[in-house]
Amino acid sequence: MSYILFDDNSRYSLQPFTHTRAIADIRCGIYTMRERWEQLLRSKTDTLTEEHLQSIYTYNTLPGILETVYGMEANVATIFVNGSVFATEALVKAINKLEAGQKLVQGDVLIAANTEDTVYYKNLNSVTEGLEAIAYEPEVQRLKNNWDIFSKNDAAIRADFSIITKGRKSAALPAHITITGKENLFIEEGAKVYAGCIINAEAGPVYIGKDAEILEGTMIRGPLAAGEHSVIKMGAKIYGATTIGPGCKVGGEINNVVFFANSNKAHDGYLGNAVIGEWCNMGADTNCSNLKNNYDEIKIWDEHTNKSVKTGLTFCGLLMGDHSKCAINTAFNTGTVVGVSSNIFGSGFPEKFVPSFCWGGSEGMTTYDINRAMETANR
């Protein structure tokens, strides 16, 4: 059996993060959505997404999947699984029980489908429409909006911690740090936690990945996930639920933030209730508001519908797409959305929506030259 993780329409409300990836490659918790599915399915997966992104995934295509996606004769049984859905053991069991010609649904949400028909991204709904519907009763959790990535991170870290630590023993806990709730702390081999660190895992689990470094004087309050080769700088104050993805460097004060991978917020400054994509960099003393002075509900700009939408949240900070950067002393307003590969600098607050490939700040924006953007990304 082979599995293809498909994008549903939530990919549009998950921008700017889905400009550069399928939904399945969004990180929330310790894992990306794909990594969680693969852990529980005990199988590699492939991807069905927008045409302009599909070529990214074909290089790693499993036998038979390419034929299924592009309409040639398939030679392997395939189940399509919604990449926006959080995988669970119970859900995996229900999916694996599907017979050819059946689909698993909850309301109008397609969770999974076992179809022998040729499937393209644009005809997925029409192909699965006539399948026998099997209702899944337990409530499924999904990524439906970009702010879900940080607001659902607490539950995701807890679930992933149970998966990744099941039947395993943590590396030795250092004697020179202060720990409360040590039964909820798991350190992978090769990770280093230096003297003077304070880790409180009573409020939620703390996972420290392989070769991660937690430098002197760091204060951590779970839930927290520090990925492989991540670094938390000296004296940092980290509140849960926070994910520091592989290769990230962070410092200052951080509260309920998801860093995807290879991004830096290495200096002082506040960042809360936020999502930072891959290969982003935030200059020293960057500060981001996450609460309106009147405590009102926060609205953010929806790039797909080209209008402001309600989040239902009182706390919402910065949502920054891949490869975007900001200079020292940058200040972001509550609920700011920054697209892909933008460069922000100067005094004052930039607009609350900064499109992709913009260069400038509060005094005006110009288009970031694509060749210069590519040069920076390639470095």
Whereabouts are the PLM-identified features?
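Extended beta-solenoid/beta-helix repeat architectures
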Residues: 168-182, 186-277, 292-293, 319, ...
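Glycine-rich hexapeptide-repeat left-handed beta-helix
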Residues: 10-13, 25, 30, 234-235, ...
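General secondary-structure edge motif
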Residues: 13-17, 21, 129, 171-172, ...
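Terminal amphipathic alpha-helical/low-complexity segments used for targeting or macromolecular assembly
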Residues: 1-184, 190, 350, 356-379
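Conserved beta-strand and immediately adjacent loop positions that scaffold enzyme active sites
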Residues: 77, 196, 341
